[in-house]
Curated annotation (Swiss-Prot):
GST N-terminal domain mapped to chain residues: 15-98
Enzyme Commission number(s): 2.5.1.18
Protein name stated in the entry: Glutathione S-transferase gliG
Species classification: Eukaryota, Fungi, Dikarya, Ascomycota, Pezizomycotina
Catalyzed reactions: RX + glutathione = an S-substituted glutathione + a halide anion + H(+)
Length: 240
């Protein structure tokens, strides 16, 4: 095993992130929102190089977010990596009444449907659009436009869902869940504008995103994630 940084001590849940930029926060904010919603004590570790051997042992995909946590008996260190997995882990470990993760099989099955849809469709489509539009050295207009077109298809699906009678949130009618948290960063006005889309074309989706954005936990998470790596300590362990 590669030697981990000396300041990486797992006494409680540790969320791994990178320095906050315009394009680095859309996935890391998801578990942070859930931690804020549930009031879970945690630490933040800002990774300087996700390609570092020690970090690839935590997440073989070499991306954030990722989590290390103590097992309930304190004997082992548990890990979760990729944003959807971190949401599922936090909900399973800390959402004891199932408010955000689902209270029964019926709720969890619907939550998993919309969580999986995001993981398989909007999430990766939006991520690759951002990559080809912002980071890829060669501009590929057809690729960029195809990905943007696929995003509109996903927005259409979400709009139809939210147009169903009484459907205030994606999975459940009465309250948000981890499916809403996963979807929000790529289905909100600022992100749609980044894609060059008029978010007003999806009025129910826009209403939903505003409703989600007004939650105090969501506000705190967005504020915090933007500042990671910009304080007195740029990289390494930051206490929550």
């Amino acid at each position: 095993m590669s030697e981990r940084p000396s300041d990486l001590v797992v006494n409680r849940l540790v969320l791994f992130v990178v320095k906050g930029t315009a394009t680095s926060t859309h996935n890391t904010v998801k578990p942070l929102i859930l931690l804020e919603e549930l009031g879970v004590p945690h630490d933040i570790y800002v990774v300087e190089k996700v390609s570092a051997p020690w970090f690839s042992e935590i997440n073989p995909h070499k991306m954030v977010p990722a989590i290390l946590d103590r097992s309930p008996d304190g004997r082992d260190t548990l890990r979760a990596w990729e944003s959807t997995s971190t949401l599922m882990y936090i909900a399973d470990a800390y959402d004891k009444d199932g408010t955000l993760g689902g209270r029964n099989v019926q709720e969890r099955s619907e939550i998993n449907n919309w969580l999986t849809l995001h993981t398989a469709a909007l999430g990766p489509t939006a991520k690759y659009w951002l990559y080809f539009y912002k980071l890829h050295p060669e501009k590929l207009p057809k690729t960029i436009e195809k990905l943007r077109s696929n995003i509109t298809v996903q927005y259409d699906i979400l709009e139809r869902r939210l147009n169903e009678p009484g459907q205030q949130y994606l999975a459940l009618k009465d309250r948000p869940t981890i499916a809403d948290i996963a979807t929000l960063p790529f289905a909100m006005k600022s992100t749609a504008e980044l894609f060059g889309l008029e978010f007003e074309k999806w009025p129910k989706l826009q209403e939903w995103s505003v409703r989600m954005g007004e939650r105090e936990a969501v506000k705190r998470a967005w504020q915090r994630v933007a500042g990671f790596g910009h304080g007195e300590k740029e990289y390494g362990m930051l206490e929550a």
